[in-house]
Amino acid sequence: MSIKSDRWIRRAAEGGMIEPFEAGQVRTVNGGRIVSYGTSSYGYDVRCADEFKIFTNINSTIVDPKNFDEGSFVDFKGDVCIIPPNSFALARTVEYFRIPRSVLTICLGKSTYARCGIIVNVTPLEPEWEGHVTLEFSNTTPLPAKIYAGEGCAQMLFLESDEVCETSYRDRGGKYQGQRGVTLPRT
């Protein structure tokens, strides 16, 4: 497997791999500095949309991935999301992805957030998966933490195999195929 360059990412985006797509790095908006997004040398920095689900323990329930209680989240829409101390929030990317059959995509958090104790977690985007990426932001600090909608939050790295997989995510009818919006756990 080899990592794909900015040139490859731009060509793949022309075919609809990333929508909307930014061909370069955006670092300012209306003269103000932002957490960057867009194409980098060997990756694509995604933006966080303005839809959030903030985890709360008001129901004092057990967190069970096989039987997740949607009441454990408070829905929020806005330009800035405040994550409570030692808690987390779910969000989604602005971008919609269509991953090629020969490609596996790995997501890593941006250092701007990591250096503040905010960790971004996303599982790999498998071959032929498509949808908005659900992002998990963990606030590891004892203080409230800010997430900015419309700005960069994580980087996607595209790895292309020298051999096409026998069975893709679409082939096996993956449960998150075509997801739109913030998607909660499914079994």
UniProtKB/Swiss-Prot annotation:
Keywords on record: Hydrolase, Nucleotide metabolism, Nucleotide-binding
Gene3D superfamilies cross-referenced by the UniProt entry: 2.70.40.10
Coiled coil location: none
The enzyme's E.C. designation: 3.5.4.13
Record keyword Nucleotide-binding present: yes
Top-rank taxon: Bacteria
The keyword Nucleotide-binding is assigned to this record: yes
Molecular function terms from GO: dCTP deaminase activity; nucleotide binding
Pfam family, one: DCD
Residues annotated as binding dCTP: K110, S111, T112, Y113, A114, R115, T134, L135, E136, Q155, Y169, Q179
Metabolic or biological pathway: Pyrimidine metabolism; dUMP biosynthesis; dUMP from dCTP (dUTP route): step 1/2
Subunit record text: Homotrimer.
Protein name as it appears in the record: dCTP deaminase
Organism: Bordetella avium (strain 197N)
